[in-house]
Amino acid sequence: FESCISFGSSFGGRLRVPGVARLAAGNKHEYLRPIRPGDEFHIYDKYMGFEEKETRGKAYRMFIESVPRYFINQRDEIAAIATGRNIYLATPPSKRERRDNKPYADKKRHHYGKEELDIIHQGYEEQLAGVGRRGAETRYWEDVVEGEAIRPVVKGPYDVCDACARTVVSCYTYAFAIKWAAMRKHLQHHPIDPETGEYRFRRDWHYEDHAARLFGVPYANVGGIHNEMMLVHGVTDWMGDDAFVKVMDSQDRRMNFLGDMTWVKGKVARKFVENGEHLVELEVWGENQDGVVHTKANFIVRLVSRAEYQSSF
């Protein structure tokens, strides 16, 4: 939700050391109060450093980098905290193996048949008509059943238009001198395009297959924050207007490529009461046309209690 307020996500991911690979790990979003029209924010990041994770039987050491970003409104209240996370894999030179195969080397773009497209387009028609959107019909905590599924939401096949929409909303807009300023101090991480002789900015691998191949993957890939946004759609449709998302904690499991589908699916993991709030935990994931999960997240949603609502009158 808050990614449109500030410049993308928090500024971790700056460690660049030969032999140390960095991967996006997913983000945690905490919402302490509503963000309302007209609110103004000042924002700061708090660097939390690295935490080593145990990796038995692996040649590398794994570290998780965490950088929470705080959104402070005009009333000096913390409205939200978005914690960006990166995974670093550090392999000693003596244990590095030559890799002849590039990641996702066997990935082939799927060609969708008429039956598949009919299902996709029907899903979009239903979204436009509001089918499955809870809206003003209150979902009461007492009516929720653990284990019940949320209605699937269709997204895709993902294309450049979708990628550009994410770029604008997330404020990841780099061009000309601003783009050069972002990459000039570490050009060794930006490959030279053999067609033009110029360096290619890493963001380009989200839009163009040619650029993606320069970075070692076969196709342009979906930005992680957009995968998260897709999952949110399934949750907000399910919960209705009177509910409130308190926490979203996501994990990036694998790349999602242009041309891929995302089917947002989920279920109720548990319902509980904590600090007087009636809460539901949802397990939500996005899977592609092959049924492979690329992103997963746990949501904590506050619902209205029918008993408390009735007792207030």
Report each predicted region and the residues it spans.
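Catalytic-pocket segment enriched in acidic/His residues
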Residues: 206, 218-222, 226-273, 287-289
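Small beta-barrel nucleic-acid-binding modules, principally OB-folds
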Residues: 22-32, 244-253
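HotDog/MaoC-like acyl-thioester-processing domains
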Residues: 26, 31-146, 152, 165-167, ...
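Hot-dog-fold acyl-thioester-processing enzymes
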Residues: 1-26, 90-242, 306-313
